[in-house]
Amino acid sequence: MTPVHFSFTSAFILGLMGLAFHRTHLLSALLCLEGMMLSLFIALSLWALQMEATGYSVAPMLLLAFSACEASAGLA
């Protein structure tokens, strides 16, 4: 596992652990969800760049759109 993959995997796991342990406060739970979505977005973007597949380049943008919808629904 390269250091880049390790850092994004650990960022996702830290966000997941923060979500599991900070369920009492809504804002901290939403921030943990945003951290998880951001690490997934960067990981999917890097994966599409490494594979040099243009068909997979749409997936990070869809994930970013769903993440924005999740954040706006949570803060409403």
UniProtKB/Swiss-Prot annotation:
Molecular function via GO: NADH dehydrogenase (ubiquinone) activity
Membrane-crossing residue ranges in chain numbering: 1-21, 29-49, 56-76
Coiled coil: none
E.C. number(s) listed in UniProt: 7.1.1.2
Pfam families linked to this entry: Oxidored_q2
Reactions catalysed: a ubiquinone + NADH + 5 H(+)(in) = a ubiquinol + NAD(+) + 4 H(+)(out)
This protein's GO CC annotations: mitochondrial membrane; respiratory chain complex I
Annotated membrane topology: Multi-pass membrane protein
Localization in the cell: Mitochondrion membrane
UniProt keyword annotations, A-Z: Electron transport, Membrane, Mitochondrion, NAD, Respiratory chain, Translocase, Transmembrane, Transmembrane helix, Transport, Ubiquinone
Family of this protein: Belongs to the complex I subunit 4L family.
Function summary: Core subunit of the mitochondrial membrane respiratory chain NADH dehydrogenase (Complex I) which catalyzes electron transfer from NADH through the respiratory chain, using ubiquinone as an electron acceptor. Part of the enzyme membrane arm which is embedded in the lipid bilayer and involved in proton translocation.
Protein name (Swiss-Prot/TrEMBL): NADH-ubiquinone oxidoreductase chain 4L
